[in-house]
UniProtKB/Swiss-Prot annotation:
NADP among keywords: no
Keywords, comma-separated and alphabetical: ATP-binding, Cytoplasm, Hydrolase, Nucleotide-binding, Nucleotidyltransferase, Nucleus, Transferase
Signal peptide: none
Residues annotated as catalytic: H161
Pfam families reported in the protein's UniProt record: Ap4A_phos_N (PF19327), ATP_transf (PF09830)
Annotated GO biological process: nucleotide metabolic process
Residues where substrate binds: K53, N96, K97, N148, G154, S155, S156, Q157, Q163, N283, A284, T285, L290, K294
E.C. number(s) listed in UniProt: 2.7.7.53, 2.7.7.5
Cysteines joined through disulfide linkages: none
Name the record gives this protein: Diadenosine 5',5'''-P1,P4-tetraphosphate phosphorylase 2
The organism's taxonomic lineage, starting at the top: Eukaryota, Fungi, Dikarya, Ascomycota, Saccharomycotina
Family: Belongs to the ATP adenylyltransferase family.
Job description of the protein: Ap4A phosphorylase catalyzes the phosphorolytic degradation of bis(5'-adenosyl) tetraphosphate (Ap4A) into ADP and ATP. Can also use other Np4N' nucleotides (where N and N' stand for A,C,G or U) as substrates. Cannot catalyze the reverse reaction. Additionally, this enzyme can also catalyze the phosphorolytic degradation of adenosine 5'-phosphosulfate (AMPS) into ADP and sulfate, the reversible exchange reaction between inorganic phosphate and the beta-phosphate of a nucleoside diphosphate (NDP), and the synthesis of Ap4A from AMPS plus ATP.
Localization of this protein: Cytoplasm; Nucleus
Length: 331
C-alpha cells in the first residue's frame, strides 16, 4: 500500500522542506509533568511564538452579511510539502507546514469532505497501515494518529484530515497502561469501553489485536462505530440537561477527538476547544498527554500544579462514566 522506505522518504522530505523554508518549524521547549492522583504523565511543550497564530480563524462576512469561504490549504498543497500525491487512492499524505514536532504528517482526503464527518472504514485502515509503516519498535519510535472532529474538538481546518506525529521518546500515554495485556473486544451494552477510574474526564478506549493480520476494515469500523455511539450518547445526555445552552450552533454540533496507535483506539467527547483560566486550547493530542502551551502564565500554573492540566482537560470535555452501568440506550 505504501513505499517500504516511507519513513526515510518522510524524513528526507521534511529536512529538505525545513532547509528551503517551506516548513516553518516552531521552536519550543518541553518538560515532563505527572498528575499523581490521575496517574497521567504529561509532556508540556512551551511555544510562545504561537501566541500570534489563531487556533481557528473566525468566519469572515462580506458586505451583504454572507460568509466568505475560507481558503482551503489542502486543495492545492505545495509540492514541497507532499509526501505521497496518491495515498491509497483517496488521500494525499502531506507535511504539516507549521509543526511543533518534526515529521508531523497530515492525511487529507482528495475529495473535499467536512471535518465534522465521522471516519470511514477506509480512513481507519489507511491510518492504521501508515502507523504500521512508520513505527520502528527496535528504535522505540512510535506514532500517534489523531482526528479532531467538529468545531469544539480543536480542529483548525474544515477539509477532512487526520494527523500523525511521532510520540516523544519513551513517552507513555495513559491509554497504553489502560489497554496493556487486554484482548480486543467490541463495546456494547454489556461491556463498556475501557476507562481509567482515576481519570476524571470521559475517555473510551479499546485495545487493538496484537496480530496486525487480524486488523481489517471491518474490525476497525465496528470498533470505531461502537465507541462513537457511546461518545454521542454523552451529547444526548448533555443536551437534555442543558436545553437552554443548546442554541449556539457550534455547541450543538457533537465534537470529539479520535486517537489511535497500533495498539489501541480511543475516543474523547468534547464540550469546548478552549479553557479560559488559565488560557489554553486542546486538540486530540492533549488527551494523550501532549500539551501545547503558548503563554507564560499558563505554563507557570501547570508547573506549580500538574493536576491543573487534568482539570483543564476535564473543563473541555465531559465527566468520566467509569463504573456507570451501560444500557441499550448508550449503544
Amino acid at each position: 500500500m505504501f513505499p517500504s522506505n516511507l519513513r526515510e522518504i518522510v524524513e528526507a522530505t521534511y529536512e529538505k522542506a525545513v532547509a528551503n523554508g517551506h516548513v516553518k518549524f516552531t521552536e519550543s521547549s518541553s518538560k515532563k509533568l505527572k498528575d499523581v492522583d490521575a496517574g497521567i504523565s504529561y509532556q508540556v511543550t512551551f511555544a510562545p511564538s504561537l501566541q500570534s497564530k489563531p487556533e481557528r480563524l473566525p468566519i469572515a462576512i462580506d458586505e451583504n452579511g454572507a460568509p466568505i469561504p475560507k481558503k482551503d490549504p489542502f486543495a492545492e498543497p505545495e509540492p514541497e510539502l507532499t509526501i505521497l500525491d496518491d495515498c491509497a487512492g483517496d488521500y494525499k499524505l502531506l507535511l504539516n507546514k507549521y509543526p511543533v514536532a518534526a515529521n508531523h504528517l497530515i492525511l487529507v482526503t482528495k475529495k473535499y469532505l467536512l471535518q465534522t464527518a465521522p471516519l470511514s472504514p477506509k480512513d481507519l485502515l489507511t491510518t492504521y497501515k501508515l502507523l504500521q509503516e512508520l513505527d520502528d519498535e527496535d528504535e522505540m519510535l512510535r506514532h500517534l494518529a489523531f482526528y479532531n472532529c467538529g468545531p469544539n474538538s480543536g480542529s483548525s481546518q474544515d477539509h477532512k484530515h487526520l494527523q500523525i506525529l511521532p510520540l516523544p521518546y519513551k513517552f507513555v500515554p495513559y491509554q497504553d497502561k489502560l489497554c496493556s495485556g487486554k484482548e480486543h473486544f467490541i463495546p456494547n451494552a454489556k461491556t463498556e469501553p475501557l476507562q481509567d477510574a482515576k481519570i476524571p474526564f470521559a475517555h473510551y478506549a479499546v485495545p487493538l489485536p496484537e496480530d496486525p493480520e487480524k486488523v481489517d476494515e471491518d474490525l476497525l469500523a465496528m470498533t470505531f462505530v461502537s465507541l462513537l455511539q457511546r461518545t454521542l450518547s454523552m451529547f444526548q445526555d448533555w443536551e437534555g440537561s442543558n436545553a437552554e445552552k443548546s442554541n449556539d450552533d457550534e455547541a450543538s454540533i457533537p465534537a470529539y477527538n479520535v486517537l489511535m496507535t497500533k495498539e489501541w483506539l480511543c475516543l474523547v467527547p468534547r464540550s469546548k476547544a478552549f479553557a479560559e483560566t488559565p488560557s489554553i486550547g486542546f486538540n486530540a493530542t492533549g488527551y494523550a498527554g501532549l500539551v501545547l502551551v503558548k503563554w507564560d502564565e499558563t505554563l507557570k500554573v501547570l508547573n506549580e500544579n500538574p493536576s491543573a492540566v487534568t482539570k483543564l482537560l476535564l473543563e473541555c470535555s465531559f465527566p468520566s462514566t467509569a463504573g456507570a452501568k451501560p444500557t441499550e440506550y448508550h449503544y
